[in-house]
Regions:
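Phosphate-binding loop of NTP-binding sites
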Residues: 25-31, 62-67, 79-224, 228-237, ...
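Conserved hydrophobic helix-helix packing surfaces used for dimerization/oligomerization
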Residues: 8-9, 75, 115, 141, ...
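N-terminal leader/targeting and accessory segments in enzymes
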Residues: 1-100, 104, 219, 249, ...
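A glycine-rich beta-strand to alpha-helix segment
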Residues: 71-72, 423-454
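Nucleotide phosphate-binding/pyrophosphate-handling subdomain across enzymes
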Residues: 2-8, 18, 25, 29, ...
Length: 458
């Protein structure tokens, strides 16, 4: 179904961060947009305020009449929705056009110049950073992001004048194979989603195939330390980047007085005096990749400087809630061992002489089973680790797989404990912290506003 032929859109799994951006896109086109989600959230409430019709019961009778015409209704679903979902079955049996979120984004990369960011981790921050640079430049852009931009308060940026669309390319369920990027950054390929891929080799092969999809005339910007093999089409340029080496990299890095500055080294034009608006060490590497893609498409040196200086970050990505001499409290979506490592390393670099404590909620039984030793090694960079029960998301429990696997493998010297998430607020009330971070992609983040209030009241 062509986008121009659509009159109504129904989203199954409307409250997901990626799906909500699709909802906002179609709402901006003045279409009827409705959908289902399992539970209400701040995001679904925001969508309802913006005009979307959402219900929270798996019930075909609750589908609006405006979304029951198969000829002009597009149904979009997330891979997390089971195939036997009653509403999905209804649409399938009645001949509706049903597409994954990634298929919709793939259509947009055929009508716009898609600037895509893929990778196990780093893709949300890098894509949001690139979108901000582009949006405030003379080029402008549309953007479908995997997190809520602090600059815009949304995960979707609309431009009526730009041919560029920045997209976070999701490797889960091989969704990014629907895209046809003009250019792409690949930030990392540390194995993940082994419940889907089975093996590390299959995971890396999925990224290799993704590189084949970049359009001739475009470019691949790949982190130089990745072990994957790219296989681009003729006419696609390949650039390497990292913090310290590659075609694009940083020099003269200075981390002092709570700020970070560096020079951006580029085969096109070096740009001195880059200042990070969100001064987190990992954002040096993310910034190099974001600036590389923006510069390759025509952003000027001043636009790069301004974009990086005014970049405000992403909700739940090294997201400071309290930051003063007595207490630092932040929330971070990190849920893969390498992400945990980067988060812990950044905290260590920023707060060398302070006690660093993490409350971590592991995400998925399969991920915990596959990587519990890696989680323990990464968390052991911190002084204290408080482990919550595993957040199951779409999964059923696996016998013998609990947070204790991580607990038992933490290195000697690390203070450690286990707690139910319902007891977290009581713990925070009962003791003092120096630097505290809530880690994970589960629902522990719902407690962050209350934790913030408790800590501020002390």
């Amino acid at each position: 179904m062509e986008i121009k032929d659509i009159k109504a859109v129904y989203l199954v799994g409307a409250g997901g961060i990626g799906m909500s951006a699709i909802a906002r896109y179609f709402l901006s086109k003045k279409l009827v947009v409705a959908g289902y989600d399992k539970t209400p959230s701040n995001l679904t409430h925001e969508l309802e305020k913006e005009g979307m019709l959402i219900h929270y019961e798996e019930n075909v009778d609750l589908i609006p009449e405006a979304c029951k015409d198969a000829k002009n209704t597009l149904v979009v679903y997330t891979p997390a929705i089971p195939a036997e979902h009653k509403e999905l079955v209804y649409f399938r049996e009645n001949g509706f056009t049903i597409e994954k979120r990634a298929q919709v984004l793939g259509t947009l990369t055929r009508t716009h110049k898609g600037l895509c960011v893929a990778g196990t981790h780093g893709k949300t921050s890098t894509s949001t950073m690139c979108a901000h640079i582009m949006h405030q430049s003379h080029l402008d852009c549309n953007a479908f992001l995997g997190g809520i931009s602090k600059n815009y308060g949304t995960n979707y940026i609309l431009s009526d004048k730009s041919d560029f669309v920045v997209i976070e390319a999701d490797e889960f369920d091989r969704s990014f194979h629907w895209l046809r990027p003009w250019m792409s950054v690949i930030t990392s390929t540390d194995p993940d989603h082994l419940d889907i891929y089975g093996t590390k080799e299959a995971y890396l092969e999925s990224f290799r195939h993704y590189t084949e999809l970049i359009q001739p005339g475009g470019a691949l910007i790949i982190h130089k330390d990745l072990e994957m093999k790219q296989h681009v089409q003729d006419g696609v340029k390949i650039y390497e980047y990292s913090q310290d080496e590659g075609d694009f990299h940083a020099e003269n890095i200075k981390i002092e007085n709570g700020g970070i500055t560096f020079d951006f080294i580029s085969p096109i034009e070096n740009v001195t005096g880059i200042e990070l608006g969100q001064p987190v060490p990992i954002n040096i590497t993310n910034g190099v990749a974001a600036m590389a893609m923006a510069q390759l498409n025509g952003c000027t040196a001043d636009e790069l400087r301004n974009g990086m200086k005014t970049y405000g970050g992403v909700d739940r990505r090294f997201d400071f809630k309290i930051k003063n001499d007595k207490l630092v409290f932040l929330s971070d979506y990190a849920h893969h061992p390498k992400e945990i490592y980067q988060s812990a390393k950044s905290i260590r670099e920023l707060y060398k002489n302070r006690k660093n404590t993490a409350i971590f909620q592991p995400h998925l039984y399969t991920r915990t089973r596959d990587f519990y030793k890696d989680f323990a090694n990464s968390l052991s960079l911190l002084d204290e680790v408080i482990l919550c029960d595993i957040y199951p998301a779409r999964e059923q429990p696996i016998p013998g797989v609990t947070s204790k696997l991580i607990y038992d493998n933490l290195k000697p010297g690390v203070e450690k404990s286990m707690i139910h998430k319902e007891d977290v607020l009581g713990l925070v009330k009962s003791r003092d912290f120096d630097v505290l971070v809530v880690l994970g992609a589960g629902d522990l983040d719902n407690y962050v506003p209350e934790i913030t209030k408790i800590l501020e009241s002390k």
